[in-house]
Amino acid sequence: MGDARLDENAHVPVYTVNKDAVTYAKRLIDTRQYVLRSRWQDVQPRAREQNAFLKTHSWEEYAAWHLGLTEGADEETKARYAFVYGDFRRLHRLGLIACHYRAAEWRHKAIELAAHELLQYLDRKIAS
């Protein structure tokens, strides 16, 4: 009998934190470019909104809205960017919560912590 164990996350992509996106999210918070209450499922950018944004913005600007970078994915492809937290105009508190939840669900600890820290940062700014 071998010691082979089934890795339940074997086919789950690996992500690193997009530090530029964290910096951009903090800038949005500092300049009050956020929505505290929204229906994230209604405002989360879908393919149509993503494509429209990319027609008039750079990949660098697109990347700034995503907390995760997919390891191994080609640069300047949508597959490279994950964990969107805003609607390409404003940060959404529920977008950060969705990032936190999804990262925790799939055990992407660095993304989970980045989303959590941004939530705390936002909540401190609101309270002050």
Predicted regions and their residues:
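A charge-rich, low-complexity, intrinsically flexible signal that marks solvent-exposed coils, linkers
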Residues: G2-S128
